[in-house]
Regions:
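RNA-binding accessory domains that recognize and position tRNA/RNA substrates
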Residues: 1-183, 193-239, 308, 356-361, ...
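A conserved beta-strand->alpha-helix junction
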Residues: 229-255, 343-345
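A short alpha-helix-loop-beta-strand transition element characteristic
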Residues: 334-342
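Active-site adenylate/phosphate-handling loop in enzymes that bind or generate adenylated species
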Residues: 133-135, 172-179, 250-251, 255-328, ...
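Structural beta-sheet core signal
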Residues: 184, 208-210, 243, 288, ...
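Small/polar glycine-rich anion-binding or flexible loop at a beta-alpha turn
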Residues: 292-294, 342-350
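Conserved G/P- and acidic residue-centered "switch" motifs that form tight phosphate/ATP-binding loops
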Residues: 189
Length: 401
């Protein structure tokens, strides 16, 4: 039935003279999402509105599902449109529309006309009144309620006449790419994909780095992270995923540093490597999935020790959330089932039985001096041998690299 969509946005609408930049970015993200759908679509931006018209047959549910992944969209209005062939023809179209959607239900409605074409022979109030009367005559179970109707029937008089009565909630946020770029430390767990999703919602384009530790972590663990990146890319757009072989660095830390400090020291070197790649790729910050107090390495003292090695800001979108809240989002974005697959990542091996929760930074730095003779070479090797893949959802939803 529906041949078109009106795209509503919220935050973009309060922008000033640069609003067109945000609108253009939103159009590009809509195009990216619709490439995953069967059918051809045209997108028009006119007078503060974005319209999507189907040029061929398409799967309605598939289109809605993909549009719901586009940050910046606050609402999706499925529409029909007709050529302006006179008011009598419009009345018949309106009656058919109401019958098809609502049948003989006892419901209240109001008509909300909008004339972008001021030369239309009826004014807004006349359109509202005449169409309301036609609906009442054709559907006697309907009643008018101008204050709190169950149905708001919108009729827009433009070059064509657009009709819609439903607004499907979008994800909100800002279009990806309008908020700069940052580097996500992506593990195989639940939290970091959620962090990537949440920062993308604020318009930030993400790259990602994954620390692989063969043979202690398997190729299945690596593939799991690629799959998580693919799932996040439905929302974020294509992700450059940098895969670092971290094994030799981990072994050196294990051999030369106190075991209760393994996790903190390991994470400090992860942050150093991630920041190096971030600077090379013009990222403006790092992103992690940490939440205060969730594990020993995420106490305030531990986070301060981790931050100390960075000059770039570290963004932690999950910082004030409990695990249940993070899990709920991971379920909503379909990363949860992949995250809980039982493949270990490098953060789960060489774990101390009693990790320090209040690390002393001076002590940590003193113990890191045990690595001075090897660590620079190990880090250089890890960076020089990194593997970079581009992960995206293609038209079939598969991973492409």
């Amino acid at each position: 039935m529906f041949k078109s969509f009106l795209i509503k946005y919220a935050e973009i609408g309060v922008k000033g003279k640069n609003r067109y930049l945000f609108e253009d970015a939103l159009v590009q993200q809509i195009k990216y999402a619709l490439r995953r759908c069967e059918g051809e679509f045209s997108i028009r931006k006119t007078k503060g509105r974005i319209y999507i018209d189907a040029e061929t047959d398409f799967d309605y549910d598939e289109a809605i599902d993909n549009l719901k992944t586009v940050f910046g969209i606050s609402g999706i209005c499925p529409m029909i449109y007709v050529e302006d062939e006179g008011f009598e023809k419009l009345c018949g179209t309106i009656v058919d529309y109401m019958k098809n959607l609502y049948g003989e239900q006892n419901m209240t409605f109001k008509v909300m006309a909008r004339r972008a074409r001021k030369n239309y022979p009826l004014d807004t109030m006349e359109i509202n009144r005449e169409l309301g009367g036609v609906i009442l005559e054709a559907l006697p179970n309907m009643k008018v309620d101008v204050h709190n109707p169950q149905i708001e029937l919108n009729v827009e008089i433009r070059e064509k006449i657009y009709i819609y009565s439903e607004t499907i909630p979008g994800p909100g946020g800002m279009p990806v790419g309008t908020g700069g770029k940052a580097m996500l430390l992506l593990s195989g767990g639940i939290d970091s994909p959620v962090a990537g999703y949440m920062i993308s919602k604020r318009g930030v384009k993400i790259d990602a780095v994954y620390f692989h530790a063969p043979p202690y972590t398997s190729e299945r663990a690596k593939q799991k992270v690629i799959d998580l990146a693919r799932l996040v890319s439905r929302y974020s757009g294509p992700i450059y995923l940098h895969i670092i072989n971290f094994t030799d660095i981990q072994l050196a830390i294990y051999e030369k540093c106190p075991h209760e400090e393994l996790t903190i020291i390991m994470r400090r070197y992860m942050m150093k490597i991630a920041e190096t790649i971030a600077n090379e790729t013009e990222c403006l910050g790092l992103i992690t999935g940490e939440s205060i107090g969730q594990v020993a390495s995420q106490t305030m003292h531990s986070l301060a020790a981790t931050n100390e090695v960075c000059t770039l800001p570290v963004y932690r979108p999950c910082i004030g959330m409990d695990k249940q809240e993070i899990v709920k989002i991971s379920e909503d974005i379909n990363t949860y089932e992949t995250s809980i697959l039982p493949y270990e990542d490098c953060c789960t091996i060489f774990v101390a039985k009693h990790p320090v929760t209040k690390p002393n930074l001076a002590v940590i730095k003193r113990h890191e001096k045990n690595l001075e003779d090897v660590i620079d070479g190990l880090m250089e090797t890890a960076l020089n041998t990194k593997e970079t893949v581009i992960v995206r959802c293609d038209e079939t939803g598969n991973t492409t690299m």
